[in-house]
Amino acid sequence: MNYEQLSALVIQWGEDKGIFAKSTPLRQLDKTQEELNETKEALEKLASLTNQEILDDVLLSDDFGNISLEEDALAEAKDGIGDMLVTIILLAKMVNMDSVDCLEAAYDVIKKRTGKMVDGQFVKD
């Protein structure tokens, strides 16, 4: 499925769950923040794993479907990023915008932006 198809399914899901009728853009933004925090925790967990912990986990796993700590943290991060996308798609719809249009508008602003990396973050000029 492409992004537009998935977005339409997310919007229909939100409609079916009553999110548009019973929530507000600010409450949806709170949900986005909640998902962002969960994603940050998963990425921090991934970053804190040492090679020895990963190796120990892999060596201790059996053939019964156990996954390593690293794979678990990656799965949590993937879930968190997906959940953030869902909340952003719903938020855009709540304010009568299309998330793809929002992304395109943001890209149009940043595509020629100059700046530099400072402490692992891009800082615009």
Model-identified regions with their sequence ranges:
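Flexible "arm" and connector segments at domain edges
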Residues: 1-81, 85-125
